[in-house]
Swiss-Prot record:
Protein's pathway: Cofactor biosynthesis; adenosylcobalamin biosynthesis; adenosylcobalamin from cob(II)yrinate a,c-diamide: step 7/7
Recorded catalytic activity of this chain's protein: alpha-ribazole + adenosylcob(III)inamide-GDP = adenosylcob(III)alamin + GMP + H(+); alpha-ribazole 5'-phosphate + adenosylcob(III)inamide-GDP = adenosylcob(III)alamin 5'-phosphate + GMP + H(+)
Transmembrane portions of the chain: 10-30, 40-60, 113-133, 188-208
Name of the protein in its database record: Adenosylcobinamide-GDP ribazoletransferase
EC number: 2.7.8.26
Organism listed in the record: Aromatoleum aromaticum (strain DSM 19018 / LMG 30748 / EbN1) (Azoarcus sp. (strain EbN1))
Length: 259
């Protein structure tokens, strides 16, 4: 198998795992391949960001920016199957309602959403929508560029946790168990290239603010996960992606306020 073919298969493996988008039938799947596919998680963000940006630019031709933002968010949620939003809600439930490590992990594994998860999910969606609507005041293209930058960067944030932290679930049936192996330095560099490259679409001040805010959110999340759990779970990765995505939007907004 050629190296290029193998890398393409890994990308499609990541795309099939993290989205509901169809992938070619010839792409094989295995836990080992999913683990190695982690390097392409930010590249999946390129696809999701492009879907969101294209949807927004299409909807805003017919509708007010606020409605266009909501509809574009609905499209990206549909494309990903609310994969990361589910992780955010589970993390909110577990960290909000659990007193010790075991209880937090047990609550996070429960498929039912609780009060913390509901409140956290609603607030997250409202915050992202509000941030994007505010960005629309600076031009519709600004919203599209923010989406193109935030989705890859936030997935790089999640990927960095796989490299720096321990996976803490012992359940072999856990959906994210194949991600338990730490990324190599080379794999992290590949992920970083795909995660950081879209920042070039932004003005320098915006890119710096987005990167700073995202890094701060990721470090804070990692500290919370380490203190409460001693590592990360799949839900933690989803929560980190959601929090980092919001942080990216807020960083861009902050840059606009000081330009």
């Amino acid at each position: 198998m050629t190296t290029m073919r193998y890398q393409l298969e890994l990308f499609f493996t990541a795309l099939g795992f993290f989205t509901r988008l169809p992938v070619p039938a010839w792409v094989p799947w295995s836990p080992e391949r999913l683990n190695h596919a982690a390097r392409f998680f930010p590249l999946v963000g390129w696809v999701v960001g492009a879907i969101g940006a294209a949807s927004y630019l299409a909807f805003v031709q017919l509708l007010p920016p606020a409605l266009a933002v909501l509809l574009s968010m609905a499209v990206t949620i549909r494309a990903t199957g609310a994969f990361h939003e589910d992780g955010w809600a589970d993390a909110c439930d577990g960290l909000g309602g659990g007193w010790d490590r075991l209880q937090v992990l047990t609550i996070m594994k429960d498929s039912r959403i609780g009060s913390y998860g509901t409140a956290g999910l609603v607030l997250m969606l409202l915050a992202k929508a509000a941030a994007l609507v505010e960005l629309a005041a600076h031009g519709n293209l600004q919203v599209a560029l923010a989406l193109l930058a935030a989705h890859p960067l936030s997935r790089l944030a999640s990927t960095s946790l796989i490299h720096t932290m321990q996976y803490v679930r012992e359940d072999e049936s856990a959906k994210s168990k194949p991600l338990a192996r730490r990324l190599s330095a080379t794999e992290l560099v590949v992920a970083a290239v795909f995660g950081l490259a879209p920042l070039a679409l932004l003005a320098p001040a915006e890119a710096l603010a987005a990167l700073t805010a995202t890094a701060a959110a990721t470090l804070w999340a990692a500290r919370v996960f380490a203190r409460r759990l001693g590592g990360y779970t799949g839900d933690c990765l989803g929560a980190a992606q959601q929090g980092s995505e919001l942080a990216c939007y807020l960083g861009i907004l902050a840059a606009w306020n000081f330009i």
